[in-house]
C-alpha cells in the first residue's frame, strides 16, 4: 500500500469532471476548509478521530447542508485515494448534523428585516427583501432581470444563476451567468401583495429600465457582486441586532420555516425553493413539519 502522500498533494492530483458551478464549490471547500485543517496530514493520518474534530469545527460556523456537503466531498476524496492504492481511513463520520435554530431568523427578526427593507429603494436592499420573501438563493437573486418581474400576472420568473465560477485554466473566479443546475430550479414564484407593491415602486424608481437590465444593478447598470449584498446584509443585521448565527443564506431557511408554520405543503415548498426533489425538502425541513404536526395534534386534542 502507498503511504507517502499528503492530502494536499492528493488534492493537487485530482481532475474535476463536474459542472463549473460545482467545481467552484469544491475548490472553495478545499481552499477554505479542507486544506487548512487536514492538508498537511498524510492520508493514513486522517483518522476517524481527526475527521470528527474536523466536523466539529465545521459545525461551529457553517450551515448544516454545507457541513454535509464538505464531509461528503472529503469522503469521496478518500475513497478515490483508496482505489488508487493509498492507505486511508474510510470510516468517515456521519454527515448528518443537528438542525440549529439559531441560524434561522425567528418571527420577530423576520418581521424587523421586512419592515426595514420594504420601503427602501436601494437595489441591495431589494435583493435582501427578495431572498427573504421568496426563498431565492443569492445567485438566483443576482441572476434576475427586469423582464423576470411580471407585475400583471403577479409572478417572478427564475431563469438564471449568477455567481463566481472557478476557471482551472486561469485559476481565477470570474463572474458568470448560467442556467440553474437542475430543471426544477427554473421556476415561477407567485408574488404576494406586499412584495408586488415593493417591486412596483422599485421599478418605477428605476425609470422605465431596459427589460434585459439586471434587476439588482448598480448605477452603471451592472449586476452587483454577491459579496456586496452579503456585506449589506451584515450591516443591516448589526443595525437590527440580529443573532450572530444568522447569515444571508439563513433568509432562505427563514422563508421555508415561515411557509411551513403557515400551513404550506412540503410539495409546494419544494417547488418554490427549486429543490431537486420533495425528499430533499423533507430531509432539510422535516423538523418544522414534525413541529407543525404536533401543533395540529394539540388542536385536535381539544375535541376529546
Regions found by a protein language model. Name each.
Residues 33, 41-56, 60-93, 137-139:
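N-terminal DNA-binding recognition helix of tyrosine site-specific recombinases/integrases
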Residues 64, 68, 83-144, 152, ...:
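Basic, Lys/Arg- and aromatic-enriched nucleic-acid-binding interface segment
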Residues 192-243:
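Active-site/catalytic core of tyrosine-dependent DNA strand-transfer enzymes
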Residues 1-49, 202-207, 211, 290:
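N-terminal DNA-binding module of tyrosine recombinases/phage integrases
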Residues 116, 168-172, 262, 283, ...:
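DNA/chromatin major-groove-contacting recognition/catalytic segments
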Residues 65, 83, 129, 133-136, ...:
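C-terminal catalytic core of tyrosine-transesterase DNA break-rejoin enzymes
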Residues 5, 17, 162, 273-298:
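Catalytic-site neighborhood detector that most strongly recognizes the C-terminal catalytic loop/helix
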Residues 107, 143-201:
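Conserved tyrosine-mediated DNA breakage-rejoining catalytic core shared by Y-recombinases
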Amino acid at each position: 500500500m502507498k503511504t507517502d502522500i499528503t492530502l494536499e498533494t492528493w488534492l493537487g492530483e485530482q481532475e474535476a469532471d463536474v459542472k463549473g458551478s460545482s467545481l467552484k464549490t469544491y475548490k472553495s471547500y478545499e481552499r477554505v476548509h479542507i486544506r487548512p485543517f487536514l492538508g498537511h496530514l498524510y492520508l493514513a493520518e486522517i483518522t476517524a478521530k481527526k475527521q470528527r474534530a474536523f466536523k466539529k469545527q465545521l459545525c461551529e460556523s457553517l450551515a448544516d447542508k454545507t457541513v454535509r456537503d464538505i464531509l461528503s466531498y472529503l469522503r469521496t476524496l478518500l475513497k478515490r485515494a483508496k482505489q488508487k492504492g493509498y492507505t486511508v481511513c474510510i470510516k468517515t463520520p456521519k454527515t448528518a448534523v443537528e438542525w440549529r435554530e439559531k441560524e434561522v431568523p425567528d418571527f420577530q427578526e423576520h418581521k424587523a428585516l421586512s419592515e426595514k427593507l420594504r420601503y427602501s429603494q436601494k437595489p441591495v436592499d431589494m435583493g435582501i427583501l427578495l431572498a427573504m420573501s421568496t426563498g431565492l438563493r443569492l445567485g438566483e437573486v443576482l441572476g434576475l432581470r427586469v423582464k423576470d418581474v411580471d407585475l400583471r400576472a403577479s409572478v417572478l420568473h427564475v431563469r438564471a444563476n449568477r455567481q463566481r465560477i472557478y476557471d482551472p485554466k486561469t485559476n481565477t473566479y470570474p463572474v458568470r451567468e448560467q442556467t440553474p443546475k437542475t430543471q426544477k430550479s427554473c421556476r415561477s414564484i407567485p408574488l404576494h401583495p406586499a412584495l408586488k407593491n415593493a417591486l412596483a415602486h422599485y421599478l418605477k424608481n428605476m425609470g422605465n429600465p431596459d427589460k434585459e437590465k439586471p434587476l439588482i444593478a448598480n448605477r452603471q447598470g451592472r449586476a452587483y457582486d454577491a459579496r456586496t449584498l452579503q456585506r449589506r446584509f451584515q450591516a443591516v443585521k448589526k443595525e437590527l441586532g440580529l443573532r450572530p448565527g444568522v447569515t444571508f443564506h439563513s433568509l432562505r431557511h427563514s422563508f421555508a420555516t415561515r411557509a411551513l408554520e403557515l400551513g404550506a405543503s412540503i410539495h409546494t415548498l419544494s417547488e418554490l425553493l427549486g429543490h431537486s426533489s420533495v425528499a430533499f425538502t423533507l430531509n432539510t425541513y422535516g423538523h418544522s413539519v414534525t413541529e407543525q404536526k404536533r401543533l395540529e395534534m394539540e388542536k385536535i386534542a381539544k375535541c376529546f
